[in-house]
Amino acid sequence: MWLLFAFLSALFAGLTAILAKCGIENMDSNVATAIRTIVVLIFSWVLVFVMGVQNGIFHLSGKTITFLVLSGAATGASWLCYFHALQIGDVNRVTPIDKSSTILTMILAFLFFGETVGAVQICAMVLMGAGTYLMIQKKETETGKKTKKTWLLYALLSAVFASLTSILAKVGMQDVDSNLGTAIRTAVVLVMAWVVVFATGKQKTIHGIGRKNGGFL
């Protein structure tokens, strides 16, 4: 069953990248992140109530809350970096780097949780890293242009924070339903995203968002 959910996660992650690229066109990426997080928050809490696990929020330990908040903060940082990278870079280059967080997550899981990393896993990580590098290089060769590498920095930061999200969530989700944990983490992301929007003074641009942008977001 976990394999099915993993495949679905990959599918929706791919759709997210395409839809987000369309949605953030001609608008601030931080505002876009804040708006789409509202949708995610509503969806996640609807799922919590549908599953009937909302009462679990009253039984969370201090440790669980702490790691869920930290995981949410890492998620927020990852999303903000990721969508800014998408805005200024190509999807074909940003997405592979972002998804390379899997490699870092496997390494951190081995270091902190003692999870097994055998020869097959090591070979897989090497191949994933090589594939990511080749995809980036191929795209640069095809364009034949030298572009600013700002997108690369944000894409790398997105991958690092995404990896930290997985590790922190692993600890925070141990004593809580995954749907409830996701909803709590998303609430943290929402607060963080809007703080960034107001801190950068971009809230004034919300009124200029078109229907196309809003629909894709």
What are these regions (language model features)?
Residues M1-F7, I103-V160:
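Juxtamembrane helix-loop boundary signature in multi-pass membrane transporters
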Residues G23, A32, A85, L111-F113, ...:
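Hydrophobic/aromatic residues within transmembrane alpha-helices
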Residues M1-L11, A20-L68, A73, W79-G89, ...:
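Membrane-interface interhelical linkers
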